[in-house]
């Protein structure tokens, strides 16, 4: 019997957060972030911190006997960056190397349908 979990990976330019829930999304199984594994604030979003956070999560998943993962990658989105941060790819790679079967990878970044105005004013950011 294969047990499935959903890995929500939120990767911004400042941090990488990994949260694993059950398939309904109601129960949190494990969570970790780049800030929990490194000391410097500037290293929270690094691929190394994301890899260590994914290793912490994978240990908790083995205790719960979860074998399959659905991965949902999210960037800040909205009026902010729509590109995931540097830790997203290394977190996915670390989870696959830990021996979990990845069923699918989804991109769930929120896209505005002409929502709020971008910051910077009428004439944009002047460099």
UniProtKB/Swiss-Prot annotation:
Keyword RNA-binding in annotation: yes
GO molecular function, one term: rRNA binding
Cellular compartments per GO CC: ribonucleoprotein complex; ribosome
Gene3D superfamilies xrefs: Ribosomal protein S11
A Pfam match: Ribosomal_S11
Membrane spanning residue stretches: none
A GO biological process held by the record: translation
Keyword Repressor: no
HAMAP family the UniProt entry points to: Ribosomal_uS11
Subunit record text: Part of the 30S ribosomal subunit.
Identification of the protein by name: Small ribosomal subunit protein uS11
Record gene name: rps11
């Amino acid at each position: 019997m294969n047990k499935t979990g959903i890995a929500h990976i939120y990767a911004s330019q400042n941090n990488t957060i990994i949260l694993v829930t059950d398939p309904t999304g109601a129960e949190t199984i494990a969570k970790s972030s780049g800030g929990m594994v490194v000391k410097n604030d500037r290293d929270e979003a690094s691929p190394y911190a994301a890899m260590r956070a994914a290793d912490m999560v994978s240990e908790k998943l083995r205790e719960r006997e979860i074998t399959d993962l659905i991965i949902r990658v999210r960037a800040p989105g909205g009026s902010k960056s729509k590109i995931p941060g540097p830790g997203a790819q290394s977190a996915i790679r670390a989870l696959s190397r830990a021996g979990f079967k990845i069923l699918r990878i989804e991109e769930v970044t929120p896209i505005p349908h002409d929502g709020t105005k971008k910051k910077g004013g009428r004439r944009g950011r002047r460099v």
